[in-house]
């Protein structure tokens, strides 16, 4: 089945020219075996032996996004002057309304949107679809979707697919874990298969920008899975790892590039790729990218892409900075919002907020873990305010017999990937993280989130606890709140009230007497490493190499 007479790729990776085009020569892409998923971001085969640990790594700079935040990035990129009349034409409108969708009354459509707390803005917005068949995807896409066992589209997919397939610029606002990745991935696959083949030296057709390497790798996994039948090649471009494999992928040619902004600009400045062929641009977690200071890099990257592209922007929130970005780079966009536009937490999450002093935190954390880990299937993600505290808490837990590991921006990429895999598989069901991971981690079955330190703002609180209660499941979020956090009390109570959660009387008192006193931080014990981790070798920082204490707690 071909789409609007475009270029079709069947199971044998053959291509048939359906006319149009404008790009020279139908480059065959050379690789009869297709592409297994883009090299960079894969797992590991070997174990990590060796005796002891070498005391951790020196500071690597970086923070969120692994060193992507460099203010002079992009200075070497030339400003592009676009003459749309001379650019090759491309297809971007593929949506044909299914008869069942067309025959629904407006009342039925309104009730469907109301049921899923869905609001839309813009002109000539297509109606939502209720089944995968109604979306009108080609068979090669539908077969992959059905093979995954999905029963029906999520709310954001129901409305997002018709919008994206129509070729319009799209803004989607939905909570993390709502299925938004597939909302843009499947239309991207259709878009690619309607374009002329890549010629030698061409850059990607689809570019996905993401704030963190963890999220980028997760997006790559989805693209790989659903692009498999049509041999779509991809690569993941992010900092903190050697550039060689990424350069190799780009030079061979990939239809999809998933990237963090800093490393992509590195590649562009070095001439390792170009964005001349990009006709489908995705900004995923746009709010997070702006929070992390990537706006200048995003603007430089977009300046290298033809202005008549299709742009899809996805975000969990809709602050004024994101609205401005949409206004600057999207044309006549249509928008879908799932849930309230006010900052709110997932109602499937039970939120427990305890007002504590700093010196009480460790004992209270242990008591909660004892209860949580009574069920061996549970997983707990613990958030701390700093990398230092993350490492201290991890050592403390491991020495107390708990199978905890930590992840943050100063860990080498190899170690971060290993920790994530240990957590996902349940081998280490407790993971300690900083905010660098608060939106980048996609582990579907996290049952508990524990905020050891309260975040700097309410948006980060909502995103942190959103790691649990995903894909329709229920979850529990436990938060330690101190007098040092009192300025955040009013916003937190608003979120708790909206979600109909119980409120600690001491928290309510902080709101009444807002701004209450300081109360210095209780001193943290210096849980220095004890040397000689078991079989972990010098590949791991001291906190993750600390041996489990003799009193195994799990």
Curated annotation (Swiss-Prot):
UniProt subcellular location: Cytoplasm; Nucleus
RNA-binding RGG-box: region residues: 513-536
Biased composition (Low complexity): 25-34
Superkingdom of this protein's organism: Eukaryota
Keyword terms, alphabetized: ATP-binding, Cytoplasm, Helicase, Hydrolase, Nonsense-mediated mRNA decay, Nucleotide-binding, Nucleus, Ribosome biogenesis, RNA-binding, rRNA processing
Classification via Gene3D superfamilies: P-loop containing nucleotide triphosphate hydrolases (3.40.50.300)
Residues where ATP binds: 174-181
Any one of the GO BP annotations: rRNA processing
Domain notes: The Q motif is unique to and characteristic of the DEAD box family of RNA helicases and controls ATP binding and hydrolysis.
Protein name (record): ATP-dependent RNA helicase dbp2
